[in-house]
Amino acid sequence: MTLLKTIFSWMPALVIAFLVMGCGGSGSSRQASAVLVDELGIAIQGFDPVAYHLVGKAVQGKAEYATQWNAATWWFFSKVNRQLFITSPEKYAPAYGGWCAYGIADGYAAETDPINAWTIHQGQLYLNWNAQVSTDWNADKAGYLKKSEPKWSTVQKQLQEGEATVHWH
């Protein structure tokens, strides 16, 4: 009977611990890779990376116009956009594998909001955590890029080895 009392006395603490481990932050069981993908391996939540450059807004891609590149599936709004990407993926794919540019500058990977937190700077697509972070990043692009460029190779290696600090929405 004493053993049962002990087990039940610890039960609330164990339940709370499991709940805390499963909520947000870097405690997520979601896998991280050098390219930010969803659970199905789709990059930038299925948004067409070429459309940001051509029409200046986030446009949802279609599975029927998908291609594989850099261990990720990329969706496009049209065959034309898919072909442009296939011809020059580095030109259209987001910097830092689609991870948050602001986070990379601080040495960690963070999920991004491809609808409200994106910028084209000097021909390169950058994504950020949310609209406010994107506004902050845009206020000092040069400063953040100076910090993030040398850190990306380290974060990228950590992502590939499963050792990166990752922040999920």
Please give the residue ranges for each predicted region.
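Bacterial N-terminal signal peptides that target proteins for export
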Residues: 2-11
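Charged, low-complexity intrinsically disordered segments
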Residues: 24-169
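Hydrophobic helical h-region of N-terminal Sec-dependent signal peptides
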Residues: 12-16
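C-terminal motif of bacterial Sec signal peptides marking the signal peptidase cleavage site
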Residues: 20-22
